């Protein structure tokens, strides 16, 4: 099915003084409102600066003019920003919809807010929003949530969220869905995270499965690019492919590793991205530098003898990016893709070291399992018990250390990775 995601920049022009574009705010329109608006897939998305910004997105089956209203928690001073919309075709019983985006960029650090959507005199309920206070924090990290029916993923994510109610945001490291152009799967994923993503933001990375068409051919990850309006600090011509954001004293650099899948459309993706990544990481003044990427920098040999022989070593993505991570002083690299959870410790100049970035591949959050597929790599310091099941991770940052804890679905601790720096 060919996607007809036509970009209808319907700048929902609400009659609000001083409100000219998403991000610039004014007083909310006066008059009586009814809490009868029913947006779906309401989601917060990280901003580049989460002490003062946030992106809010939602979907409706009509393309009317929408706005976002917000206030400090408990306040009667309601502000408003315009929303812009993009039409998105449905499939498999999922209706056509409009994806709305509103950007907030004048928030106060460490402050509790509430927001709601508005269409005419109809409004949604209020949702909570908290800005980054600049201190220590916790985040939930998942990867490869792609699934056959998303029931295992639903239980895993909801349990992880309930065990970590203080999480400031969550990360999905790509292959968010099994087929990136299947809107039914996207809505299944959004339904799973619905009780969390409207309260705390997501920081997604694009995976190769986001770049497959419905007939399993390579394509641009159009639905991913539509569903997540990400910080505009990457390449203007490759908006939402790669980006960076800050939380606390950590700078996160999020990469697009789908070179093979996107090559016919963006043949120079890696060259552009490498130049951007080096500049992005070097320019950050944050104490900690963390890279998020879907495809893993290491290459593994197959344990299954029926598979073609393949030497262990480093993937094309690793060969391209690891020298940049060395050069720019990256502290931690989190990856996914191989559906296995392994800690490699410090690697520098493609060798085991006592310094340089720490590399961890995070396993899987969905139910597409590869039991016994990979041999142990010479650089592996920890390998999850085999055959592997799904898992989730919790990332914590404070002044002196980063802690990444991996858990089984029942909450049993698998492993901890600790990176310290004075």
What are these model-predicted stretches?
Residues 17-141, 162, 394-422:
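Acidic, histidine-bearing metal-coordination/catalytic regions of metal-dependent phosphoesterases
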Residues 76-97, 141-155, 180, 216, ...:
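Acidic/histidine-rich helix-loop elements
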Residues 103, 112-128, 185-285, 308-312, ...:
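Extended active-site neighborhood of metal-dependent phosphoesterases/phosphodiesterases
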Residues 122-173, 178-179:
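An acidic-aromatic substrate-binding cleft motif
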Residues 145-148, 176-179, 208-212, 249, ...:
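Solvent-exposed loop/turn segments at secondary-structure junctions
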């Amino acid at each position: 099915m060919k996607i007809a995601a036509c970009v209808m920049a319907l700048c929902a022009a609400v009659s609000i003084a001083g409100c000219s574009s998403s991000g610039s705010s004014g007083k909310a329109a006066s008059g009586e409102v009814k809490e009868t608006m029913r947006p779906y897939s309401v989601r917060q998305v990280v901003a580049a600066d989460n002490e003062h910004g946030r992106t809010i997105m939602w979907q409706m089956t009509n393309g009317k003019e929408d706005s976002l209203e917000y206030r400090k928690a408990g306040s009667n001073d309601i502000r408003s920003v315009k929303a812009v919309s993009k039409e998105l075709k449905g499939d498999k019983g999922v209706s056509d919809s409009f994806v709305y985006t509103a950007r907030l960029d004048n928030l106060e650090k460490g402050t509790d807010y509430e927001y709601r959507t508005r269409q005419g005199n109809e409004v949604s309920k209020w949702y909570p929003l908290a800005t980054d206070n600049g201190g220590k924090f916790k985040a939930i990290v998942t990867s490869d949530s792609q699934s056959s029916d998303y029931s295992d993923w639903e239980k895993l994510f909801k349990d992880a969220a309930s065990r970590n109610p203080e999480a400031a945001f969550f990360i999905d490291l790509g292959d968010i869905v099994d087929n990136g152009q299947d809107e039914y799967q996207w809505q299944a994923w959004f339904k799973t995270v619905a009780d969390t993503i409207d309260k705390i933001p997501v920081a997604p990375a694009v995976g190769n499965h986001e770049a497959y068409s419905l007939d399993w051919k390579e394509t641009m990850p159009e639905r991913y690019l539509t569903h997540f309006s990400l910080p505009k600090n990457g390449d203007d011509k490759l908006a939402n492919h790669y980006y960076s954001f800050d939380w606390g004293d950590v700078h996160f650099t999020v990469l697009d590793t789908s070179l093979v899948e996107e090559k016919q459309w963006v043949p120079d993706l890696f060259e552009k991205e490498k130049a951007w990544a080096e500049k992005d990481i070097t320019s950050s003044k944050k104490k900690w530098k963390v890279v998020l990427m879907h495809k893993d920098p290491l290459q593994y040999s197959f344990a299954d003898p029926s598979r073609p022989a393949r030497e262990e070593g480093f993937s094309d993505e690793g060969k391209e990016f690891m020298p940049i991570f060395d050069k720019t002083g990256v502290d931690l690299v989190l990856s996914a893709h191989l559906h296995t959870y392994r800690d490699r410790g410090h690697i520098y100049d493609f060798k085991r070291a006592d310094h340089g970035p720490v590399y961890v591949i995070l396993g899987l959050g969905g139910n597409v399992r590869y039991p016994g597929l990979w041999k142990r790599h010479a650089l592996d310091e920890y390998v999850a018990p085999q055959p592997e099941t799904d898992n989730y991770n919790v990332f914590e940052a404070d002044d002196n250390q980063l802690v990444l804890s991996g858990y089984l679905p029942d909450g049993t601790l698998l492993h901890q990775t600790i990176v310290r720096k004075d």
